[in-house]
Amino acid sequence: PPLPAHRELIAAADLQQPLSDGRQLLAHQRAGVRWLLARRGAVLADEMGLGKTLTALAAARALLRCSATRLLVVAPVGLHDHWRREALALQLSPELLSWARLPQEPPDGGCVLVVDEAHFAQNSQAKRTQALLRLARHPRIRAVWLLTGTPLKNGRPVQLLPLLMAIGHPLARD
């Protein structure tokens, strides 16, 4: 099914409301939430330390409020505690997946897929990249948001192709 209208998603994001721990989203994070909510597939490539995790979670929360979806987060195991803490501030309970154990398909029902350290999928021949692409293309995935501070880890444009494929970008079709 189609995603709710952008205006409805922005209202559900409640961007001015403090988080449960008292923090507020910063202006660039609020802009990032609006940007993600306008896209079914996106690469959020803010620099390290700007709060990509919180931005993606706030956008996912809006989507979860407006549609019957679940939140799947792919992240290195070492970052799972960070994801849990940030999710708690938004009263979310994402299903955390490791890069080493991606499922063949998402759980039943619609899902938002957030992928942290997405540059791990820059080698189109790697098994983890293939597993991510299979998961991202599944019909139950309603949105795919990739997070990385280094979209071109080694400066080779060909490394962007798997990321573009995962989000369904038109450049990846050719």
Report residues per predicted region:
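Walker A/P-loop
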Residues: 39-59
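Walker B catalytic acidic pair
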Residues: 116-117
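Conserved helix-turn-beta segment of the N-terminal RecA-like "Helicase ATP-binding" lobe
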Residues: 65, 78-96, 167-171
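Conserved P-loop NTPase motor "coupling/switch" region that bridges the ATPase
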Residues: 68, 112, 129-174
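Charged, low-complexity
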Residues: 1-42, 89-93, 100, 111-112
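Catalytic P-loop NTPase motifs of RecA-like helicase/translocase cores
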Residues: 51, 120-124, 153-155
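Conserved Walker A/P-loop ATP-binding site and its immediately adjacent core
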Residues: 53-58, 67-88, 152-159
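Pre-Walker A (Motif I) flank of P-loop NTPase domains
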Residues: 39-44, 69, 142-143
